[in-house]
C-alpha cells in the first residue's frame, strides 16, 4: 500500500487512536521524522537466518573489503540490488541486531526501502532471495510491514541463545555451534544461580565492550534482562536463553563468560555481584566465544508489523 502524501503522519492508523498512540510511543522524534521522509518509498522486511562462521558480522564494512571481510548485510544488499534494481544507498538496509563476527542468527529482522512495488505474492521474492544468497544465509520470511517500520528502533526485546558442550568427549558436530567446556564441566545448578543474578534492570557496564561505532545507545549501560534461563537438553548439552529489552556490545557473551567462572568453581556468586557493582569492564573475565551465540528472536509491537 502506497503512503498518501496528504495523510497525517502522526495518525498512520486514521481514527484508531489506540494504535496511533502505540505507534507514536514506539518512535523517538528524530526517528519518526526520518521515516516521514521515506514515506514515498515502499518498505519491506525480512526475517533472516545465518551461519556466522564466514562473516565479520552483520554490519556492512564499506567497499573493497574483499572475501575475507564479508558481512551479512553486504550479501543481502548484493542480492537485493539485483532483485530490485535499486542502489545500495537507496535500499538503506537496516538490521535489528548488529551481530558480531562469528555470531549466528535464526531471527535477525531486516528492513529496506524500494521505489517500486514488489508485488502481492512476496513468497516469490523470498524464493528469489534464497536463489541468490549463499547457502549459509537464508531468507525465512518476506513481508510488507507498516510504512514507518524500522527493524532496530521498533524492537522491544530480543532473545539470544548460547550453547555449551560440556561432555567429556565433545560431539564433533558441536565444534562450530557450541562452546566446548568438557575439560572443566560447569555445575548446572550453579550456572542457573549465576545467570539469575543478571535478571532485572541494572547497570551492565562491567559486561559491555566498547562499541565499534561508539553508538550513543551504548553510552547508557542500563538494560533490563527479563529472564536468563539454563536448560540441560541432555547430559552435557546446555542451552542458555537470555531475553532482554536490548543488549550492549558483547554483553551476552561477557555475561556467559562470567557465569561460567562461577559454575566451574573459579569464583563464587559474591564475585559476580561485586563485578556488577564495580561497573568496570577491566575487572571482568573474558567473554565466551562467538560461535556459541545465536540471535534467536526479536520482538515488535504488533502495530508496526503489518501495513
Residues covered by each model-derived region:
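Structured-RNA-binding interfaces characteristic of tRNA pseudouridine synthases
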Residues: 1-307
Amino acid at each position: 500500500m502506497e503512503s498518501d502524501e496528504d495523510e497525517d503522519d502522526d495518525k498512520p492508523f486514521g481514527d484508531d487512536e489506540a494504535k496511533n498512540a502505540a505507534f507514536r510511543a514506539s518512535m523517538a522524534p528524530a526517528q519518526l521524522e526520518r521515516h516521514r521522509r521515506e514515506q514515498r518509498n515502499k518498505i519491506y522486511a525480512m526475517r533472516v537466518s545465518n551461519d556466522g562462521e564466514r562473516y565479520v558480522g552483520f554490519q556492512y564494512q564499506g567497499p573493497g573489503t574483499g572475501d575475507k571481510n564479508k558481512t551479512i548485510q553486504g550479501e543481502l544488499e548484493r542480492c537485493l540490488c539485483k532483485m530490485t534494481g535499486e542502489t545500495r544507498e537507496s535500499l538503506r538496509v537496516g538490521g535489528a541486531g548488529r551481530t558480531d563476527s562469528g555470531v549466528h542468527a535464526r531471527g535477525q529482522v531486516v528492513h529496506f526501502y524500494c521505489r517500486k512495488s514488489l508485488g502481492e505474492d512476496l513468497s516469490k521474492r523470498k524464493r528469489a532471495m534464497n536463489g541468490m544468497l549463499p547457502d549459509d544465509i537464508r531468507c525465512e520470511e518476506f513481508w510488507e510491514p507498516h510504512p514507518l517500520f524500522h527493524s532496530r528502533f521498533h524492537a522491544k526485546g530480543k532473545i539470544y541463545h548460547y550453547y555449551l558442550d560440556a561432555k567429556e568427549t565433545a560431539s564433533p558436530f558441536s565444534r562450530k555451534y557450541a562452546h566446548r567446556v568438557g575439560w572443566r564441566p560447569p555445575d548446572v545448578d550453579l550456572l542457573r544461580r549465576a545467570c539469575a543474578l543478571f535478571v532485572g534492570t541494572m547497570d551492565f557496564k562491567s559486561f559491555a565492550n566498547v562499541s565499534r561505532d561508539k553508538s550513543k545507545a551504548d553510552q547508557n549501560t542500563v538494560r533490563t534482562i527479563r529472564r536468563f534461563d539454563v536448560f540441560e537438553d541432555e547430559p552435557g548439552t546446555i542451552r542458555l536463553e537470555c531475553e532482554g529489552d536490548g543488549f550492549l556490545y558483547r554483553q551476552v557473551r561477557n555475561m556467559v563468560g562470567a557465569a561460567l567462572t562461577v559454575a566451574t568453581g573459579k569464583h563464587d556468586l559474591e564475585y559476580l555481584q561485586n563485578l556488577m557493582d564495580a561497573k568496570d569492564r577491566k575487572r571482568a573475565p573474558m567473554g565466551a566465544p562467538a560461535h556459541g551465540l545465536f540471535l534467536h528472536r526479536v520482538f515488535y509491537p504488533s502495530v508496526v508489523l503489518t501495513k
